[in-house]
């Protein structure tokens, strides 16, 4: 009998941030560019997150994965679904996070921005944090509009929520005797 269990693995913040710097002003050809159909910011955020975890969740609808433009989870490209997947309470494969205050963010975390009264619509990745952490010294990278090392206070937003990545769950197969 094969037993599958989840093991917690660390989040490689450095790998996520390096990926962000590499691809902030261009597009990785392995992924579709969603600029023309709603924006590429959360697709880029997911790519960065995947670079730091290496684990996807292939659960239809509720998972977090990308195979091609027609086979991906809503959480890979959708701002609210990205957040909902990360802060889920039941362990399942893939990265996980918790919402924190702005003062608690670290490089490799994500900040979602709301520009109107309705909904959050942008997901930049934090690439550097000054001390003490504040909007003028938290630097982010993003697609749609492409930016890197951009101070958070350059965004004229009404609200923000911060997602602190804690690690990822990885499924391991063990032979049971």
Q: What annotation goes with each model-predicted range?
A:
Residues 2-77:
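N-terminal capping segments
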Residues 126-177:
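Glycine-rich, aromatic-bearing surface loops/beta-hairpins
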Residues 66-140:
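...with weaker cross-activation on analogous glycine-rich loops/strands in unrelated enzymes
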